[in-house]
Amino acid sequence: MTILTPPWRMASRLIIVAIAGAAAAAAALSAPKTGPKATVGNDQAIDDTSARLLNQGREVFRFETFGDEAWWTDTIQLHRAIEGQNHGGVGGGVSPATALSVGLKVDIDAIPKKIQDAIARGAVDLNDPAVTLALLQLDAVVGVKATLSDNGNSIQSMGITCALCHSTVDDSFAPGIGHRLDGWANRDLNVGLIVSLAPNLQPIADLLQTDVATVKTVLNSWGPGRYDAWLDKDGKAFRPDGGQAGTLLPPAFGLAGVNLHTWTGSGSVPYWNAYVAATQMHGTQVTFYDPRLSDPAQYPVAARSGSWNTRGVDPGSASGKLDALHYYQVSIPAPKPPKGSFDAAAAARGKTVFLDRAQCATCHVPPLYTEPGYAIHTPAEIGIDSFQADRSPTHGYRTSPLAGLWTHQKGGFYHDGRFATLDDVVNHYDALLGLNLTAAEKRDLVQFLLSI
């Protein structure tokens, strides 16, 4: 039997449904915007911030001096050595050929095509310091920022940027001339030799309580690809055995997810950005604070100079650049090795050795190839002396990230290049840990290290 719903009851139900729908719609309109539309707006804000920081950070990394012209130009007057006496400076000046020979790099993308063609034809004299001034005016010398006179014949001011030590070029145009490779360690750069050319090294001598001749000896002891970022804190110019005390320039790529930076892990990436900008580049705008460095026993020079507590003249401006710089740095991926640069079959076998027999992954945890957290080990744990570790507040050595290792083999391995080859590193750990790896396993392991 079919039961029919009376028309009046059906109409009543429709009215109730309509009223409920209207009430729900009204509630939705009056509710806080936390739904999909708000999410889209928030996502857009994140995307906009990401793009802004990335682009700004690239500019900061490549071109920002943080006001360090006051040191390089006004104080030690390095620009005068670059100019040479024919352009108001001192000495013979620095030609492009000389600049390239000490590891400075030239960004080919900053040079107009017409001039590129002239260089390729040999129509530009690369032994003329005037050409260096022209390259500086074009912002073509990687990591050096200069303002020239109206006629381009002299340098009004000059400073350095992060890219000086932590960028190189791909040599696509000529050795030392090519497209920028941000984040790559410039292991050709002879920082000490370049600084030693400055006409006024007396401020450094006064800081270290020594003479200019000794300062030059120290600067020239480092050699290509090395720099001593602790000399102005502890004054230890040489190792106890008389060897130079500089460390290899580290890369600035593959840092996403990496907590501690540099060889002895004194701080995070933002820590080191402020440390370097304020105390090594000598940026006047940057504030840096670390009371650990005020200990007169460990850091007598810093305790005297106050470099553990610098207050920039425009810290707000600098801080607004340091966040973008950090964002850009952690956005730079570790470069993949070129195809054919390693034995793929051996690398596949070496990965198994890395993860198992050699115990490498215990500390170099994939995919970061360092340890998440506080990745510091004692000198005894890695089987070396404590000299460099004891210059750091950590008194230890950081587990260095291994991705992109193939890009910075020049100068050797470990913080001071004490191991000339990866084979030497593998042999060191084989003996230290009693691994008893076979010759084949060692070869395969090296190929894997070159593949990551």
Segments and roles (model prediction):
Residues 2-16, 21-452:
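Periplasmic c-type cytochrome electron-transfer domains
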